[in-house]
Amino acid sequence: MQIFLFFFSLILCFVLISSQTLEDDKKALLHFLSSFNSSRLHWNQSSDVCHSWTGVTCNENGDRIVSVRLPAVGFNGLIPPFTISRLSSLKFLSLRKNHFTGDFPSDFTNLKSLTHLYLQHNHLSGPLLAIFSELKNLKVLDLSNNGFNGSIPTSLSGLTSLQVLNLANNSFSGEIPNLHLPKLSQINLSNNKLIGTIPKSLQRFQSSAFSGNNLTERKKQRKTPFGLSQLAFLLILSAACVLCVSGLSFIMITCFGKTRISGKLRKRDSSSPPGNWTSRDDNTEEGGKIIFFGGRNHLFDLDDLLSSSAEVLGKGAFGTTYKVTMEDMSTVVVKRLKEVVVGRREFEQQMEIIGMIRHENVAELKAYYYSKDDKLAVYSYYNHGSLFEILHGNRGRYHRVPLDWDARLRIATGAARGLAKIHEGKFIHGNIKSSNIFLDSQCYGCIGDVGLTTIMRSLPQTTCLTSGYHAPEITDTRRSTQFSDVYSFGVVLLELLTGKSPVSQAELVPTGGENMDLASWIRSVVAKEWTGEVFDMEILSQSGGFEEEMVEMLQIGLACVALKQQERPHIAQVLKLIEDIRSVDAE
């Protein structure tokens, strides 16, 4: 009878979700929430589920819920049946770090679109049912740090799209099934009660993924030389050893007598690999809270930012920049700020101003975090990298793909539009340089690191003198203006044209002369009417006949780097001049 009721419920649930709407999704989540006493979410019937519900994301059409992120909200008890499972378009579900109890929800089989499931750090228990073959789109499954027991279900082999599997720190027992998961790149079965050997299909993973179990090492069949059987090979090897020892003994006794052989053991220094960027055990720093922009909320928490695998992109005067992959496999840039000289209130005010800037050519500030020990700014990630990397990386190498003139013109156009948007709000950037200009998918330049100079300690005078990007007046005042931004942007234009780094370098120094930056070098060359010699050979070697356009851009760049700031154009004028060279939008 119980089995009949179970299958009847599943069929009924399937009928209900087959014609579901956003309103039905909303009712399902309200039903879910009604089982708990949580005041943190602020969900209600009258509010807009797609834009104001904490942790909820809708699809582009705004007609279905596709993501529910509710980590560490404080839920207690069972996951209410037939609530979340009614979200038939759900792709991402994170309920980690709560206090859920009971079995794995059997009705999750209805979540056919689910790609990411995070239930780690709860108190779920019992055996896992053989239901995973129904979730064929699942890419990430994390059930670690619970109390699941029994055997690991063989139905996991049906998850042919699975890339990450984490079942660590449970009480699974028995042997590890031979899981044939072609796309699996990460697995963790450590700290369970598993026995037997690691199956052949999983032997490509590191042993640490299986530590803390009662596994025995699989004996590998060793091949012997010349195709001999192992017994024959051992007999021949033994005979050879006897002959060698006998011969050596005879030589030592008859010819050399007793000799001493001394040796020395060399100790090898062991060095541990560089540690990952990890968070503290708690994130309860005074007032620490992530603030999101754009009507979005609860997209990630501090643990996501600090505990995820992070790749260092660079270190600069304002701090260290990391590339962080989130649990939903999206990527953001996290800048860990140092030398912040303003208090919380001024920091938050500045971040709010930056967060209101919305433009396709300005890197979006997604969120920020302020506490006594950490100040973080979270930005969009551009997978094409920065202009500095593209322009100067691997220069001279055979596999380098040079930037053509069309690409450089798009970069200049996009960056000018971004800076014009910033200046439009009477705002100052203060640190324009090629490493702060990123390339979008269409190769337009996008301005990053907006507004950080106003909350950071002033750059030292030596940095201003040697960077090559800063206007002459910055050396004395160390205060940025919109005209100093224009100067820095002009240097970027010259950098695009010449392919040379603005920082003082030997190739820009005349024989017996003093060091000069890029702008000074170009002024000296143009004064001698050798204009053609400044252009990057990577552009000149390409066909197209763009020399006239390049000369126009050179004149714009030189106007921007005028020594007197009152002689420099406004960025809006610069943008118009660049767009007048040639329209790149229609290409």
Curated annotation (Swiss-Prot):
Residues 254-587 are cytoplasmic. LRR repeats lie at residues 89-112, 113-136, 137-160, 161-183, 184-205. It holds the Pfam family LRR_1. The modification Phosphothreonine is found at T462, T463, T466, T477. The modification Phosphoserine is found at S309, S386. It is found in: Cell membrane. This is Putative inactive receptor-like protein kinase At1g64210.
